[in-house]
């Protein structure tokens, strides 16, 4: 957790203590993917939490389109989603990151998402 240290806030600390699973994508220098990559996370338990971690590294002169989805069934009790996303974009690299979420009114969604983009990156 480089961009989101557990000392950042209490939900980052909770995430850092219990996260399991997530996505890791590494795009080497000069590689340009011409199709989107996707991941999907579903919370399937009442009164539970979801703490996935997404780490994406796109090196210099590379490109990626990444789509992430999260959802849960409608429950009559509260649930917590406290995921974390860290994005690193190299020089002249391109990252198009999208999130699609479908939560019920009983879901507390407290994601933390951060990015570092180097010169000429987008």
What are these regions (language model features)?
Residues 1-122:
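Conserved beta-strand/loop scaffold segments within soluble protein domains that form the structured core
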